[in-house]
A protein has these predicted regions:
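Multi-pass membrane proteins that catalyze or facilitate reactions on polyprenyl-/lipid-phosphate substrates
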Residues: 1-264
Length: 264
C-alpha cells in the first residue's frame, strides 16, 4: 500500500464513519463490481489504526461531553451526568450481545450479498427521509429511547444499513432533539470502537513492516482530519433537517445495487 492509497482509504473511513451512507455496504458493492480479488482486504493493523483515528476525532469534538460521562460514572449520584452515562451503557448492550453471540451469523451476511445490501440501503434511505420530515423533536434521550436506539445500532451491523443513519433517525423519530440525537449517536459508538480495537489486539495478528510506517501514519492523519470535518458537518446537517440529501443518495445506490444483483 502506498501513501496515496492510504490517504484515500483514510479519508473514506473518516467520512463514512459519520455520514449516513453505510461504509460496509459500499465495500460490499465495490467487491462485487470489481471482483473480490480486485479489492483486497485492508490489513488488520491498518483497519485498527483507521478506527482509532475516527474514534479519536470523536473524542476531540465531544471532549466535554465525554469528560462528563466519566465524571458521572464515578460520582454514583443520581444526577444528569450519571443518568447520561447509564444511557450510553444501555445503548451499547444490544450491539455487544449481537456481536458476541451471533458473530458467525453476521459474517454470513457479508461477501457478495448485493441484493441484501441494496435493500438495506433503501431501508436506510427511508429512515433518513422519515427523520428529515419528523416534527416535535425537542425531547431528551430517555432510558427507553437509549434502549431502542441501541437496538437500531445492532440492526445496523447488517451491510447496507448506516449506523449513524439508523441511530440518528431512530432518535429523531422518537422525538429526541436533533442535535442531541446526533451527539448521542456519535458518543454511543466510541466505547464499541475501542472494544473492537481491544478485541483485535488481544486476538493477535497486528503487525507491520518498517516500510508501512509512512502509509499507516498518512492514513491515520487523513482519517482523523476527515472525521473531524464529517462529524461537525453531520451535526449541522441533522440540525438543519438536511438528511434527505443522503436519503436520495442511498436510494440511488440501493436501486443500482438491486438492479446489478438481479441482472447478474
Amino acid at each position: 500500500m502506498d501513501i496515496l492509497e492510504a490517504i484515500i482509504l483514510g479519508i473514506i473511513q473518516g467520512l463514512t464513519e459519520f455520514l449516513p451512507v453505510s461504509s460496509s455496504g459500499h465495500l460490499e458493492l465495490a467487491k462485487a463490481i470489481l471482483g473480490d480479488t480486485s479489492v483486497p482486504e485492508e490489513s488488520l493493523t491498518f483497519t485498527v489504526v483507521l478506527h482509532f483515528a475516527t474514534a479519536l476525532s470523536t473524542i476531540v469534538i465531544f471532549r466535554k461531553e465525554i469528560l462528563q460521562i466519566f465524571k458521572g460514572l464515578f460520582q454514583f449520584k443520581w444526577n444528569d451526568e450519571f443518568q447520561f452515562s447509564l444511557k450510553i451503557i444501555i445503548s451499547m448492550l444490544p450491539a455487544v450481545i449481537v456481536g458476541l453471540l451471533f458473530e458467525e451469523e453476521l459474517e454470513s451476511f457479508f461477501g457478495g450479498k448485493i441484493l441484501l445490501v441494496g435493500c438495506m440501503l433503501l431501508l436506510t434511505a427511508l429512515l433518513l427521509l422519515l427523520a428529515d420530515k419528523a416534527k416535535n423533536t425537542k425531547k431528551e434521550v430517555s432510558f427507553w429511547n437509549a434502549a431502542l436506539i441501541g437496538v437500531s445500532q445492532a440492526i445496523a451491523m447488517l451491510p447496507g444499513i448506516s449506523r449513524s443513519g439508523a441511530t440518528i433517525s431512530t432518535s429523531v423519530l422518537l422525538g429526541v432533539d436533533r442535535t442531541r440525537a446526533a451527539k448521542f449517536s456519535f458518543l454511543m459508538v466510541v466505547p464499541l470502537i475501542f472494544g473492537k480495537i481491544g478485541k483485535d489486539l488481544l486476538s493477535g495478528g497486528l503487525s507491520f513492516q518498517s516500510s508501512e510506517i509512512m502509509p499507516i501514519t498518512a492514513g491515520f492523519i487523513a482519517a482523523f482530519l476527515a472525521g473531524l470535518v464529517a462529524c461537525k458537518w453531520m451535526i449541522s446537517l441533522v440540525k438543519k433537517s438536511k438528511l434527505s440529501y443522503f436519503s436520495i443518495y442511498c436510494a440511488i445506490v440501493g436501486s443500482i445495487a438491486i438492479g446489478y444483483a438481479l441482472l447478474n
